[in-house]
Swiss-Prot record:
One of its GO terms (biological process) is photosynthesis. Belongs to the Psb28 family. It is a peripheral membrane protein. It comes from Cyanothece sp. (strain PCC 7425 / ATCC 29141). This is Photosystem II reaction center Psb28 protein.
Length: 110
């Protein structure tokens, strides 16, 4: 089972919109996760130390996490994971395949 967490041990129930970009050489890339009204925000917990992508292989971590505010209230979270090598890309794709499978998601190539 693959899960995304903002606080270790607490799974985020809102499924994000994920946008991927990849360099022409295929070694580097970027994944932008956008969570609209995530549980973490609904519960009023903004003690975010990072985004943790957890599966049976272990954990992928990004610290580049930002809250979006409207009228002084947090309404969304955007997290960016930068992929710096081909092995990191392969590991990320394995995680995303597991996450998609466990949450009934699909992949659309643009």
């Amino acid at each position: 089972m693959a899960e995304i967490q903002f606080v270790r041990g607490v799974n985020e129930g809102v499924v994000p919109d994920v946008r991927l970009t990849r360099a022409k050489d295929g070694n580097t890339g970027r994944a932008v996760f956008y969570f609209d009204n995530p549980q973490l925000v609904q519960e009023g917990n903004l003690e975010i130390m990072g985004m943790y992508m957890v599966d049976e292989e272990g954990e992928i971590v990004t610290r580049e996490v930002n809250a979006k505010f409207i009228n002084g209230k947090a309404t969304a979270i955007e997290a960016i994971y930068t992929i710096r090598s081909a092995p990191e890309w392969d590991r990320f794709i394995r995680f995303m395949n597991r996450y998609a499978e466990s949450h009934g998601l699909g992949f659309n190539k643009s």
